[in-house]
Structures are given as C-alpha cells and as structure tokens.
Amino acid sequence: MNRIAFITLGCKLNYAETSTYERALLKEGFEAVSWTKGADVFLVNTCTVTEHSDKKSRNIIRKLHRQNPDSLIFVTGCYAQLKKAEIEAIEGVTAVFGATEKSQIVPSILAKVRDQEYCPEGAGRFFPAYSSGERTRSFLKVQDGCDYKCHYCTVPYARGESRNIPIAEIIPQAEAIASEGIKEIVLTGVNTGDFGRTTGETFFDLIKELNKVEGIERYRISSIEPNLLTEEMIDWITSGTKFLPHYHIPLQSGCDTILREMGRRYDTAAFAHKIQYIRERTEVPGGPKVFFGIDVIVGFPGETDELFMETYTFLRDVVRPAFIHIFPYSRRAGTPAAERKDQVQDCKKTLRVQMLEELSAQLHAEFLESNKGVSEQVLFESTDRKGMMEGYTGNYIRISRPFDPAMIGKIVDVII
C-alpha cells in the first residue's frame, strides 16, 4: 500500500502545502500517481471560498470512495476546518485535519498505512510549505491566516489568525528552491501583505531579503491587499529588483457604498491612486505594460443594478486591468452578509458575471495589443503541448514556441 494521489482544490497556498506533503511522503517510499488511475491512499486538500467549493469537495470525496472502496481517504484544507463533522460523515473518509492539524497529516498517514498508533504531540502554529517538482516556478508560503474578517468571508475562520515564521526561517526555503534549479518564486499566503504579525517584521522586510537570494531571478506576489501595498514598497519594487510588473490585487467592488458594507479597508479613490502610482513608476514609452489582475465580487447583498454599474464603470474607465477574476457572491453561514435580507437574485448575479467576463476579455485583448512589439523576457516551462512549449513574460503574457528541451528553465529575450 504505497501508491498515493493528491487532489488540490482552491488557491496557490493549498498547492504549496500539498506539494510539501508530497515531498515528505515520497521520502517515506510512497509513489505519487494520478487520482484518476486509482491509488491506495488519497489526500484531498479542500477549499471553502464558496458554497460551490464545498459541494465540489464533497463530490470528489464521494467519487474517490465509489471508485476506490478499499482505499484510505484523508481530507484537509479550509472546508475541513470549517465543516469537519460534515466531512467525517461522508462514507469512506479515513481522517479529517483542520487548519491547526496540518503537521499531523504525514505522520497520521504513515501510521495508518503501517498499522501503527500515532499520538500527536501538539499542533504547530504555522505549517511551512513550498511547491516543487516543476523546473521553472515554485509557490512559497510566507504567511497564513487573516485578521480582516470581511463581511462575506469565512476564510479567517478556516485559516485562523494572521501568522508567519521569521524571515530567517523563510530564506533557507527560498535557497532550497533555488538549489533545485527553479528560477521563479510566487509568494503566497492568505493575506500575504500582512506578513510579520507574529514576528515583529514586515512584508517589505521580507521581500528585500528574498531579493538577495542567489539563483532566484524572478518573484511574483500572488495577491496583496491594496492598503498593504505601500508607496515605499512600490518605489523599491520598481527600482530594478527581481519583483515583476505583475500585481494581483483584490478590489471586490468598485462602489464605495458596497466596499463599506463589505468591511473593506479602502475606497475607490485610494484604489485608483495605487493603480496609477504603480503605472507611473513602472511603465515607460515603448516598454511593457503592467499586468493587473483584479478580484471582484458581484451580487453582494444590497448591490442594485445602479451600484453594480459603478463597479463596471470603475473597472472599464479607471482601473483597466489586464484580467478580472469574477466571483458571484456566495452566502456563507456565520458571516454578517449572510444575515442580510437584501440578498441579490441568482439570475442577476449571473448576468453581472457575464457582463464582467465580456469586459475582462475586451480589456485583456487591449492589454495584449498595447504590448505588441515590446521587448520582454520569458521563462519557458517544461510542458510539451502538441509540440509547443509555453512561458510567461514578466508581465504575465503567455508566449508559445516549438518545444525545445534545452530551453526549459531558460529566461529568453523575445519581441511580443
């Protein structure tokens, strides 16, 4: 019984943690296989950002048991933290691990497979993790948890309070990633920019130290709250560091009324200023444009057609991102927004999602057009898709070329 399959749902942070479990279990003699081909052990890392995420997790667990009735199924992740009893009630589940029990997962799997007893000595406050196995990019977990408690979100309850390990313990992880020949690191967390709560350090301190790691040539920040991305930080990032002109920033709404009711910590004027500040300090005539990926929630309680159009107009005329990541509001038990009586009809949410998807496609096409003829650097990846390989520019434009194994992991100058 040594074949194990990993199923990861949700964010890049989950992928980093799953990769860490995988490395530890491979060292113990396990063989990683595709979950579609059957395995002796399954580890499902769940997501709970929406009700759809919960349902998807349940369906996968049931499917695994139906297709592999004699296999062991272990479940972790945010859904496992919030609804542990609900998952334990699903037929075929061997064990469920919440947010504070991640350090117990590997020893528990080993004990079960080897028919041994395992007595946990206590849960760790922070579970270090980074992804590996790819030759070009790694996701490095630098922070966990969130203290913001926005009115629609259950993630703070699933992930716990904001916490991290010291910079001095993160740098060796980045060095280990570099030793594998990986050139790019994506910094991940639940509220990444809130790094330092438990160590008296700051996210700015962290990125300045990471910038010194030899062998890593590119960094991306997976997501950062606009109020935590300071002008001082932007000035440093744009001064010739290894950090790329690629920003993933949650807006959630382009309407100040809705932002206040969501419990967000900025208004549209502050957000617009931050976007403009980045552009002014990054973009030069004839050079690459900054990639902005923006998160937006549609259909938050109380969002009328007029208030939604404020968001639409703000995105179209002011922010003009390269990509909009759109979420229809999902009613999550235990949050203030779930108790409101002015819920928006699903049909209206669907229409608003469609409108923003069309806008996102238009803005992305314009972003690509604005970068045509520009010189950029591409890090090519190992995937062979029908004789082609792909890579990404610093500002996250996908570039394809005929597959050449010698180009894997190489950073190459191209004209877009």
Residue spans for each PLM region:
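Conserved SAM/AdoMet-binding glycine-rich loop
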Residues: 73-74, 82, 179-305
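Conserved N-terminal phosphate-binding loop of PLP-dependent enzymes in the Aspartate aminotransferase
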Residues: 215-216, 320-321, 336-340, 344, ...
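Conserved, mostly hydrophobic/aromatic
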Residues: 170, 187, 221, 249, ...
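Short strand-connecting beta-turns/loops that link adjacent beta-strands
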Residues: 37-38, 147, 252-254, 384-386, ...
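Terminal RNA-binding accessory module
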Residues: 339-416
